[in-house]
Each structure stands twice: as structure tokens, then as C-alpha cells.
Curated annotation (Swiss-Prot):
Pfam families xref list: Palm_thioest
Protein name: Lysosomal thioesterase PPT2
EC number(s) recorded for this UniProt protein: 3.1.2.2
Source organism per UniProt: Bos taurus
Cited Gene3D superfamilies: alpha/beta hydrolase
């Protein structure tokens, strides 16, 4: 009468099937929620006279900003044991990180503080199957140390930096981790001949593994270098960025170092592919790098994918 379309009622058969259809919908699995890729595991290596406890703030920051991240702060060579020869430490840390890497199919990140940064760089050299994405070197003397610090005065109370080479460049001295990266710019020949660690991982002295170590190091996804002028321990502080003194104690930046110009272990190649990040920050003392929130947010968090 009003020209409206006729409405048809559901058939009896449909009404009978309706409860079963509703039950079927309830039993079907729900559509999965959008999945965000998990953060890569983070491995932390401490420095001289240090332990895992020192990194409680860093652990807190990572848990807050990247919840669910598996963070392992390695508890090896703590306290005075950190004075053990660095190659001995490298072997110990290698045994600890290998199973973590093996389980992390997407790779891992390394955060390595002070002396630990040298341990980690050696790990990247000797491990031919490592899968490190970001190696974050946190105030580490990557080109060596040449300065009077409280640590040195405690260990060698009768020596000054000008004559410490007499101890460090002896077989006895090389049994101490500090001497493994002592780099006296006034006695370069002695350093090159006597250094059992730094001169080798830098490729400054020929050895049978140099080519393989360079290849291994270049498996690295990204090298993040962190340090600053108010560190107070790393001397020169530019060593954190692969800068160092010449014979006149003038600091030459990384790009003027022979290890870079010769690309002896891969620095030049990394820089050419845009894989080196430099993050200098003033106002932070050596023992505060791993607890400074601003430093974490600026220089560390962006590289923890």
C-alpha cells in the first residue's frame, strides 16, 4: 500500500542453524594482534675494578624504554680480577657470550664500558661467527691510555706515566690488563714490539690472524663511540674516539691515525659505509657514564633496536 519493499523473515532452516554458527564463530581463533619485532638481546661488559652492580641504573633505563629486552650484565673478572691479562679475559667473556649469540637469530647488541670496550673489540676480532649489530663503546681507551690516574698510582705507586713504560713493556708488566693497552707515544717502538694486546687488535704489528680478525670485525653492524672531555680517567679522552697523542703529545683525531689510514682492522671501511657513530658529551665523569639518563637517551637508546 505504501510501496515499501517486502521484508522476508529468515527461513526455519536458518534459525535452526544459527546457534551452531554462533558456536563456530566462538571457537575460531581470534585474529592475531599486530606484532612488533622483539628487541635484540643486550650484553653488557664492565670495566676495570667493576662489577655488574655498577650497571643497575643502565639496566633500569633499558627495561623502562625497551620493555622485554633480554639484558645480560656479565659477572666475570670482577674487582681485582679485572687486572688479569686481557687475552685471558677475552677467552672467558667469549665463552659467556657465545651461547647468547647462538640463541639470538636476529643478532645482539654489546655495551662495553672502559676497559671492557677493549675486551669487546677483541671479541669482535676473534669470533668469526659473531652477530653483533651495535657495539657501543662507552668511554673506552680504544687507542690506548697514557695518563696518571688513581688506578695507576695504586697499582704502581713509585712510577709516573713518563717511566711506566719500563714496567708495562716488560713480560712481567704485560701480565696486568692496564699494561696491555698502555700506549706511550714517546716509546712507540717499544710499544709495537712489547704490546701483547692493543698492538695486535689494532693491526699495528703483523701476525698470522690479522686478515681473519679484520674480516670478523667488519661483520659488525654499527660502532658507537662515546666519551667526553670531562671523563678524568681516559687519557687523552679522545682515545674513546680512536684519537691519540703524537710524539709531541698533540692529539690526532681518528682520521689521522695510521690504523685508520691503513685501514688495518677496518675503521676506514666502517666509516665509509656510515657505520660509525660518534657521541661526545661534556660534563660526565668516568664513573658516571653508565648511570647518566641523558647520555643513555642521547647516545645509547637510539641504537638498541
Amino acid at each position: 500500500m505504501l510501496g515499501l519493499p517486502e521484508r522476508r523473515l529468515p527461513s526455519a532452516e536458518f534459525l535452526l542453524l544459527l546457534p551452531f554458527l554462533l558456536l563456530l564463530l566462538l571457537l575460531l581463533p581470534a585474529a592475531p594482534a599486530p606484532h612488533r619485532a622483539a628487541y635484540k638481546p643486550v650484553i653488557v661488559v664492565h670495566g676495570l675494578f667493576d662489577s655488574s652492580y655498577s650497571f643497575r641504573h643502565l639496566l633500569e633505563y633499558i627495561n623502562e624504554t625497551h620493555p622485554g629486552t633480554a639484558v645480560t650484565v656479565l659477572d666475570l673478572f670482577d674487582g681485582r680480577e679485572s687486572l688479569r691479562p686481557l687475552w685471558e679475559q677475552v677467552q672467558g667473556f667469549r665463552e659467556a657470550v657465545a651461547p647468547i649469540m647462538a640463541k639470538a637469530l636476529q643478532g645482539v647488541h654489546l655495551i662495553c664500558y672502559s676497559q671492557g670496550g677493549l675486551v669487546c673489540r677483541a671479541l669482535l676480532s676473534v669470533m668469526d661467527e659473531h652477530n653483533v649489530d651495535s657495539f657501543i663503546s662507552l668511554s673506552s681507551p680504544q687507542m690506548g691510555q697514557y695518563g696518571d690516574t688513581n688506578y695507576l698510582k695504586w697499582l704502581f705507586p713509585t712510577s709516573m706515566r713518563s717511566n711506566l713504560y719500563r714496567i708495562c713493556y716488560s713480560p712481567w708488566g704485560q701480565e696486568f690488563s692496564i699494561c696491555n693497552y698502555w700506549h706511550d707515544p714517546h716509546h712507540d717502538d717499544l710499544y709495537l714490539n712489547a704490546s701483547s694486546f692493543l698492538a695486535l687488535i689494532n693491526g699495528e704489528r703483523d701476525h698470522p690472524n690479522a686478515t681473519a680478525w679484520r674480516k670478523n670485525f667488519l661483520r659488525l653492524g654499527r660502532l658507537v663511540l662515546i666519551g667526553g672531555p670531562d671523563d678524568g680517567v681516559i687519557t687523552p679522552w679522545q682515545s674513546s674516539f680512536f684519537g691519540f697523542y703524537d710524539a709531541n703529545e698533540t692529539v690526532l683525531e681518528m682520521e689521522k691515525q695510521l690504523v685508520y689510514l691503513r685501514d688495518s682492522f677496518g675503521l676506514k671501511t666502517l666509516l665509509a659505509r656510515g657505520a660509525i657513530v660518534r657521541c661526545p658529551m661534556a660534563g660526565i665523569s668516568h664513573t658516571a657514564w653508565h648511570s647518566n639518563r641523558t647520555l643513555y637517551e642521547t647516545c645509547i637508546e637510539p641504537w638498541l633496536s
